[in-house]
Amino acid sequence: EKLQIALSLEKIGVDIMEVGFPISSPGDFKSVQTISKNIKNSRICSLARCLEKDIDAAGEAMSVCDNFRIHIFLATSTLHIESKLRKNFNEIIEMAIFSVKKALRYTNDVEFSCEDASRTNIDNLCRIVEKLIKSGVKTINIPDTVGYSTPDELTFIIKNLFERVPNIHKSIISVHCHDDLGMAVGNSIAAIQAGARQIEGTINGIGERAGNTALEEVIMAIKVRKNILGVSTNINHKEIYRTSQMISRICNMPIPSNKAIVGSNAFSHSSGIHQDGVLKNRENYEIMDPRSIGLKKVKLNLTSRSGRAAVKYYMSEMGYKDSDYNIDELYTDFLKLADKKGQVFDYDLESLAFINKQQDELEYFRLQFFSVQSISNNLSTASVKLLCGNKTYTESSTTSNGPVDAIYQALNRITHFPIILQKFQLIAKGKGKDALG
């Protein structure tokens, strides 16, 4: 499954994929090794702490491919240094430089993450970044590890690095944002505007706690707001939806319907005003073409707020002409069903149109109510209320072998007509518990 995800990420066109933490387990080591053998068009990266055994494991796992990256991380905030690592800042710098030199024995592509950078003293951050770049780090990652930062704060940090670190031009600035306060994507976009040129994220925003930056959201923000951001990616946008759905299934993590870009409602319209506007010109209420992420077309949700235009659109999509049905009658019945079900589907409309056409003639017999209870010994008891002309007859407690026969015995007792069941078939005209029968 990890290989399947990696192949999909390669197909979508990610530049670098971090595929595991080899020291964590033999299974993770093997999966990193397997992915490294199979991925050809994206650079493979694996994670390591500032420990020799971690770096050795990462280098050995990826040695089966030609070009790879080792991503080292170490906390730099005072809180983490004092309470977690129990060291001083000078010792942190020494550990970081030693680990970078160790990683450079395996590859010339080393990334360093200053863990909890968003809560690190800016003077200390500038100091360690300068020394890391001098030691050979090509990518400096600024993580908002606990999702604490705001866009303005992250912008301040990155601008300070560009202004105060003299060798900053020798490295790419990256950000790794978490979504604890719901600002991961906003922070990532702000970082791009401040000069960051690598964004770390995950498809669907999957990740620790509240998740990471949703990659698909950043990608489409860059595409849609290119006039503001002025950058581009190598991503194949039309693979976004397929990749999102596949990862959702593999990870058993359903995508919320209101999720930006890939949620089932992202390109759906329920309001009649919006639906009419979209049918006239989709740009009235859509800033993205759904086809740009791999979807086929716009989706109109049929609800009690939908207008006649949406109903006529769906009937047309199913091949019906305006002359095939009465829009006023159909729309009236549609609203009744929508009030009951909440959302109506195209097959419901078809059923309503069919039922309307079949019930034009006055009915002498009309079934008002029936109830069936199955009891032991395969016996069933049926209660039936039947309208005959203007008079209502009621028959109850008719027992027979099976529920269908019990109903027909009850009907026969009321009408005294011989009822012969020639064919019995139960078909749901639609889906779900509210389907029309």
UniProtKB/Swiss-Prot annotation:
Write down the EC number: 2.3.3.13
The places in or outside the cell where this protein is found are: Cytoplasm
> Which sites bind Mn(2+)?
H176, H178, N212
GO CC terms of this entry: cytosol
User: What's the catalysed reaction?
Assistant: 3-methyl-2-oxobutanoate + acetyl-CoA + H2O = (2S)-2-isopropylmalate + CoA + H(+)
Q: Which parts pass through the membrane? A: none
Q: Where in the numbering of this chain does the Pyruvate carboxyltransferase domain appear?
A: 1-241
Under Gene Ontology molecular function, one entry of this record is: metal ion binding
Q: In which pathway does it act?
A: Amino-acid biosynthesis; L-leucine biosynthesis; L-leucine from 3-methyl-2-oxobutanoate: step 1/4
What's a Pfam family this protein contains? Answer: HMGL-like
Keyword terms of this UniProt record? Amino-acid biosynthesis, Branched-chain amino acid biosynthesis, Cytoplasm, Leucine biosynthesis, Manganese, Metal-binding, Plasmid, Transferase
Q: InterPro entries from the xrefs?
A: 2-IPM_HCS-like, 2-isopropylmalate_synth_dimer, AIPM/Hcit_synth_CS, Aldolase_TIM, LeuA/HCS_post-cat, LeuA_allosteric_dom_sf, LeuA_bact_synth, PYR_CT
Q: Which family does it belong to?
A: Belongs to the alpha-IPM synthase/homocitrate synthase family. LeuA type 1 subfamily.
Q: Any idea what job this protein has?
A: Catalyzes the condensation of the acetyl group of acetyl-CoA with 3-methyl-2-oxobutanoate (2-ketoisovalerate) to form 3-carboxy-3-hydroxy-4-methylpentanoate (2-isopropylmalate).
Q: Subunit structure, per the record?
A: Homodimer.
User: What is the recorded name of this protein?
Assistant: 2-isopropylmalate synthase
- The species is Buchnera aphidicola subsp. Uroleucon rurale
Q: Which gene encodes it?
A: leuA
